[in-house]
Amino acid sequence: EDLPMIPDPFRLVVRQVRTDRGMVTDIAAGRQLKVIGEVLAGCESIIVATDAGREGELIFRWIYSHLGCTKLFKRLWFSSLTDEAIRKGMADLREGYEYDSLYAAADSRAKADWLVGMNASRALATASGSANNSIGRVQTPTLAMICARFKENRNFVSTPYWQLHIT
C-alpha cells in the first residue's frame, strides 16, 4: 500500500541522530554547516575544490543549495595533490556553470539510488516479513560478489599442483 515511495519534492536535511527524544539534528553537522555558511557569507569569491568528479560536485552543490547561497563560484579541477597540479588548476579555474551537467547527473543518480533502495527494501521487507534486509544499487551486487567468493572458498577442494619424484 505504501509503495512506491516518491517524495515530492526531494528535500535535503542535515544529518539526523537517534536520541531518546527521537531523531534530532546532529549537533556537529549543524555546527559545521553554520561555519561554512558564515565563510560563504563573508567571502568575495568562492572556489570549489571538492573531489574532481560527480560526487565532489554533488557535495558542494548540496551544501551551497542548503545554505541558500547565490554567489557565483569557480571550479578548481585537479586529480593530483602535487604542487604543480594544484598551481595548474588554480591557473585554469572554470566557471561553476560549466559543471551543471555533472551536478545534474550526480543529483539524478543520488535520487535514483534513494528511490530504488527505499522502495526495493520496503518491498523485500513486506515480501519476506523481515525488516532487516535492504537492497541498494551498489550494496546488492557487492554483497552478491562477497557471497559468491564465500561459497567458492567454502567449496574449495585442495588439489596438488605438482608431485615430487626422486630419480
Predicted segments, located by residue:
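Intrinsically disordered, low-complexity regulatory segments
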Residues: 1-110, 114-118, 141
